[in-house]
């Protein structure tokens, strides 16, 4: 195995695929990059047995093809120290030594045989397949992933639920305290769903930022495959039935507030400094053209209050929210103005972005209230 490659191109590929590698691998070989050279294409694969990511680049001056397992940390640490320059990489097929040569020096890294590297799971013959544009997939993941849980007892809530329906694609994330539903119009007639784990969802976010072409998504009952231009991600899906999220979204919300999002976020942050550190409770008294924010910590005799101007249609209402969740919800809405819909102090608040024109997607965020002590 022998070829020449740009140092920056190789580092970029290894850094991206290296995000899969776990700090607690059960198999020593999983601490390695699987590097395969066929023709002028260098393919690099990493896996943690649950998620597998591969990427490829074009290399020059190919002397011979081959496959090797290269130690991930050593390869990354070495390549980070190089400026942009051509590297000649040669592998000794007898002892798996990896030699990296450049204009003014060389280094040697011990590799390993790739024979024991785990095979990539294959989809069943009954798998489904769909093509999605980058903006739809990255938009759905970005909007919902922050609301997913870390709950060993309810693993189905630890991922992003993706539901395909005729002309509509829905992404949902929830941890039982907050819920986000993102819907986008599509041109598919597919009816299916799966739960994407958090780790591959985050990996897709980072890889998709550099993609422009459409993505092919294939899946069966156990695994999903995301095929991009230069990368392929294969992951095991979360098994189980996702909660009926539509049942918890209140539909009759007569009280509606329009408020400047940044002004509200900044007000919450200032007032929340004086909230109880255990509950982070912040009280919202909503009335005509104003939202009054209050927080206090009785144990330390501290309190804060601020009034935010708003446009309000409804009855006066008092409701409590966890300030950290409230800030998180508002931080994931990108419009200058946000609409808050409320039924009463015991039901969830619904948060929606306010757009100036019609959108191909809609976002709904829900936050459960907290009890306010009289």
Which residues make up each language-model segment?
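Structural preference for solvent-exposed beta-strand-turn elements
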Residues: 1-374
């Amino acid at each position: 195995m022998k070829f020449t490659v740009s140092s920056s191109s190789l580092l970029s590929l290894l850094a991206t695929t290296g995000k899969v590698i776990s700090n607690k691998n059960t198999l020593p070989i999983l601490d390695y990059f699987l590097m395969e050279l066929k023709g002028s294409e260098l393919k690099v694969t990493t896996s943690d047995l649950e998620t597998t990511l591969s990427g490829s680049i074009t290399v020059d001056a190919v002397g011979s093809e081959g496959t090797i397992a290269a130690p991930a940390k050593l390869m990354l640490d070495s390549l980070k120290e190089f400026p942009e320059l051509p590297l000649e990489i040669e592998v000794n097929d007898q002892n798996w030594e990896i030699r990296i040569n450049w204009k003014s020096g060389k280094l040697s890294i011990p590799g390993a045989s790739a024979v024991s590297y785990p095979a990539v799971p294959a989809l069943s013959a009954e798998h489904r397949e769909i093509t999605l544009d980058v903006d739809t997939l990255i938009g759905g993941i970005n909007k919902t992933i922050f609301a997913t849980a870390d709950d060993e007892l309810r693993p189905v809530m630890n991922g992003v639920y993706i539901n395909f329906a005729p002309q509509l694609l829905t992404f949902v994330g929830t941890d039982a305290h907050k819920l986000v539903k993102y819907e986008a119009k599509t041109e598919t007639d597919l009816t299916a769903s799966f739960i994407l784990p958090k780790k591959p969802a985050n990996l897709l976010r980072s890889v998709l930022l550099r993609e422009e072409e459409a993505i092919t998504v294939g899946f069966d009952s156990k695994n999903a495959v995301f095929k991009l231009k230069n990368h392929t991600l294969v992951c095991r899906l979360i098994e189980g039935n996702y909660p009926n999220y539509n049942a918890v979204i209140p539909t009759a919300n007569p009280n509606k507030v329009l408020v400047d999002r940044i002004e509200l976020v900044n007000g919450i942050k200032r007032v929340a400094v004086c909230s109880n550190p255990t509950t982070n409770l912040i009280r919202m008294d909503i009335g005509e053209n104003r939202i009054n924010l209050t927080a206090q910590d009785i144990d330390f005799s501290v309190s804060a209050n601020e009034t935010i101007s708003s446009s309000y249609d409804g009855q006066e209402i008092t409701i409590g929210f966890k300030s950290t969740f409230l800030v998180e919800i508002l931080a994931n809405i990108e419009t200058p103005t946000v609409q808050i819909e409320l039924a009463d102090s015991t039901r969830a608040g619904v948060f929606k972005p306010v757009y100036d024109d019609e959108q191909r997607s809609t976002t709904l965020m829900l936050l459960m209230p907290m009890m306010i002590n009289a």
